[in-house]
Amino acid sequence: NSAWCALRDSVTETGDGIRMALWAGAELEAGGACMIWNRAILPDGFEFNEDRMGGDIFLPGSQPFLHVNVNGERFMNEDQCYPMSYAAGANQPKHYSWIVWDGNYWDDIAQFDTCGCSRLYPAPSGTAFNADVYDCEAMSKEHLDEFWLNPRLEAGTLKKADTLEALADMMEFDADQKATFLATVERYNGLVAAGEDTDFGKPAYRLSDVGTAPFYAARIGGELLVTIHGVITDVNSQPLKNDGTPIEGLYVCGNDQGGFYPHNYPSNFTGINAGRTATFARIAAKHALGVE
């Protein structure tokens, strides 16, 4: 539901490619849709109005740390793909959630072993996932702190405290919400110690204790990632007019190309969008060059 997408602006996601194809006479796939993921960190006082001011992108938002709502309650198995995690939080009161972790976060991130563009810990194979997907710098705890955590701490969007009680105050919980939050963390830590999430079924290796100071919390909402519909093309990646004939000399690939996603972005298939972009671009280039 894009109504609760907190971060909608991007200099790279303005639809120019699709517009240019339509101006040339191409046909747009029916049923527009977009993919929203859990990468927006929200400031105090954030409101879902027309402006939606103050949100920022936050790569660690996709880590499966403890999530609680504005009442301090855990409400989900946090080991979800991006849009499902966003949707779960968007359906909570005020349409966002808090993600909570402790001072052992780097060890926890290594244990989580997430893949794709949520990966923060260097991969043992030495692949491209060892680089931050946003600035291509080598991933490390120092980089995570310098590039992602410290600037948000300075901005006040990321909360940090020496005790859970103080953290709850920074999260603006009232007395009842604070008591619920502290009980939630205690319950969650018990599940971690037991090695089994009997509340929501999160796998044991994605459970992480919240017990070592300092403690952190971030208000997480949805960020617009990508359109998942686009221009209708033929097998050569040439856009089609409404009569089904191709527009010669024009090719549409990548996110501007339709007919690939059934109005759902399957983010549990790592690299699916990059893979289809490279594949259909190669097909288009070969056709343009007249080679088999």
Q: What positions do the PLM features span?
A:
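Short, ordered coil/turn segments that flank beta-strands lining enzyme active or ligand-binding pockets
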Residues: V70-N71, V235, N242, T279
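Short beta-alpha connecting loops at secondary-structure transitions
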Residues: S2-A6, F48-M53, L149-R152, N264-N273
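Glycine-rich loop(s) and the adjacent beta-strand/alpha-helix scaffold that form part
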Residues: N1-D44, Y86, N268, A274-I283
